[in-house]
């Protein structure tokens, strides 16, 4: 790929991430092209359609979440799961439009599976350390992330909740529910 083509592609992906994070599925490819300061033809040379661009953006988003899990794995076992879920919450809140449920089918399955595997290991480490209840399952971690996503979406769309960061309180409730009596 030519250098200018690579630069344009990177600009498009960065712009798409910002536009989709802000506007969610309502964003158009025209919005992305404008934000990237390129013409529509340049966008379509790089990405055949909106789904292709969304897949690329979601791949980057999931790679960052995997990086979060890798960092959390370096934390002590009693803190790793908390670090992971808190940082995922921050990422989801910062890029709320990227977590739109309608884009779930476009999420890159190998990256989703790696994220699940890593979050499961964080849970198992916390359970072995005695800080997470033994009956908490990997599905509970997934449900916690879905719940955060829902609260964050509500904060975006409901003026009564806008800007209150209720997701943080909700996460604290979830984390308390995950903790063992000893933790």
Which residues does each PLM region occupy?
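All-alpha amphipathic helical-bundle segments outside canonical DNA-binding/catalytic cores
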Residues: 107-111, 128-143, 161-165
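Helix-turn-helix/winged-helix DNA-binding modules
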Residues: 24-25, 45, 133
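Amphipathic alpha-helical interaction segments
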Residues: 11, 31, 52, 79-87, ...
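Hydrophobic alpha-helical connector segments
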Residues: 56, 66-93, 104-108, 112-116
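C-terminal peripheral helix-coil segments that are non-catalytic and often amphipathic
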Residues: 83, 116-129, 147, 154-183
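Alpha-helical DNA-contacting segments of helix-turn-helix folds
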Residues: 47, 54-61
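Short hydrophobic/aromatic patch on the recognition helix
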Residues: 37-47
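Basic, helix-initiating cap at the start of DNA-binding domains
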Residues: 1-35, 52
């Amino acid at each position: 790929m030519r250098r200018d083509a690579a630069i344009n592609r990177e600009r498009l992906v960065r712009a798409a991430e910002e536009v989709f994070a802000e506007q969610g599925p309502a964003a158009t490819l025209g919005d992305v092209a404008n934000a990237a300061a390129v013409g529509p033809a340049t966008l379509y040379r790089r990405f055949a359609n909106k789904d292709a661009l969304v897949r690329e953006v979601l791949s980057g988003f999931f790679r960052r979440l995997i990086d979060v899990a890798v960092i959390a794995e370096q934390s002590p076992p009693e803190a790793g799961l908390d670090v992971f879920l808190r940082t995922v919450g921050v990422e989801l809140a910062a890029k709320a439009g990227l977590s739109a449920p309608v884009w779930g089918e476009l999420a890159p399955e190998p990256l989703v599976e790696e994220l699940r595997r890593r979050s499961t290991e964080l849970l198992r480490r916390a359970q072995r350390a005695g800080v997470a209840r033994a009956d908490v399952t990997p599905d509970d971690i997934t449900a916690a992330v879905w719940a955060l996503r829902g609260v964050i979406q509500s904060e975006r769309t409901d003026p009564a909740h806008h800007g209150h960061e209720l997701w943080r309180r909700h996460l604290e409730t979830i984390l308390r529910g995950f903790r063992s009596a000893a933790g």
